[in-house]
A protein has these predicted regions:
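Divalent metal-dependent catalytic cores for phosphoryl transfer on phosphate-bearing substrates
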Residues: 9-17, 34-134
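Non-catalytic interface/linker regions that flank or bridge core catalytic/transmembrane domains
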Residues: 1-4
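N-terminal glycine-rich anion-binding loops that anchor highly charged ligand groups
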Residues: 24-25
Length: 134
């Protein structure tokens, strides 16, 4: 999936835009996601990227998040548009597409839904959801 240089770009962005605590959390989620992916037969490279970037939008101010969500190319329902705690997942899924040109549907889904479980979650989404909890 992503080479070391690309991963370095992701990490540099996160270091610049997240608190040290949030960055460490993102690294831990990425590593846990890899272990879960190996155990449950998912793509470990995708798990690492999705885990690393799952909170890319976590520390963006609420008004900015709302603007990203309102302009999102993703299918966002009315309930989601009113649920501020969900904004960082939706905005994060949007941002990785625009900032990093990531368009893999599994990665986008895993980032978008990492805060809430949804019906028929793809395996990678389940993995990142769980990795974020442990």
């Amino acid at each position: 999936m992503a080479d070391k240089k690309t991963i370095g770009i992701y990490k540099a962005y996160l270091k610049e835009h997240l608190s040290k605590k949030r960055y460490t959390h993102s690294m831990n989620v990425a590593n846990s996601a890899v272990e879960l992916a190996k155990r449950y037969g998912a793509d470990a490279d995708k798990a690492y990227v999705a885990g690393l970037l799952h909170d890319v939008a976590k520390e963006i101010p609420a008004l900015e998040l709302a603007a990203i969500v309102s302009k999102s190319s993703l299918d966002v329902c009315d309930i989601e548009k009113k649920a501020v705690p969900l904004f960082h997942g939706i905005a994060g899924a949007e941002l990785v597409q625009t900032l990093f040109d990531i368009h893999d549907p599994e990665i986008i889904s895993a980032i978008r839904y990492h805060t809430v479980a949804c019906g028929n979650m793809p395996k990678l989404s389940q993995i990142v959801y769980l990795a974020d909890l442990i």
